[in-house]
From Swiss-Prot:
One of its GO terms (molecular function) is toxin activity. One of its GO terms (cellular component) is extracellular region. Binds to muscle nicotinic acetylcholine receptor (nAChR) and inhibit acetylcholine from binding to the receptor, thereby impairing neuromuscular transmission. Belongs to the three-finger toxin family. Short-chain subfamily. Type I alpha-neurotoxin sub-subfamily. It is found in: Secreted. Keywords: Acetylcholine receptor inhibiting toxin, Ion channel impairing toxin, Neurotoxin, Postsynaptic neurotoxin, Secreted, Toxin. Expressed by the venom gland. This is Weak neurotoxin E3.
Amino acid sequence: LICFNDFSPTARTLEYCQIGITTYNPS
């Protein structure tokens, strides 16, 4: 499961994951 920000899939990945404003990719 990959957690990433809608605006920047590669930036601050873990931070956005922890904050909760994330999008989840089933890949």
